[in-house]
Amino acid sequence: DEAQFKECYDTCHKECSDKGNGFTFCEMKCDTDCSVKDVKEKLENYKPKN
């Protein structure tokens, strides 16, 4: 969901920047991390419950 992604991205980007990493590095890292997290959560929801 878009709001969750934005929250994940904003938090990640701030933490990444605070560590002294560059904007583009953080943008790519956080975009990937948060996209993967989003996909993972969706997959968890689709798994059949045994």
Curated annotation (Swiss-Prot):
SUPFAM superfamilies: Pollen allergen ole e 6. It comes from the Eukaryota. Expressed in pollen. Disulfide bonds join 8-34, 12-30, 16-26. Signal peptide: none annotated. One of its GO terms (molecular function) is IgG binding. InterPro entries: Pollen_allergen_ole-e-6, Pollen_allergen_ole-e-6_sf. Keywords: Allergen, Disulfide bond. It holds the Pfam family Ole_e_6. PANTHER family: MAJOR POLLEN ALLERGEN OLE E 6-LIKE (PTHR35632:SF1). This is Major pollen allergen Ole e 6. It comes from Olea europaea (Common olive). The gene is OLE6.
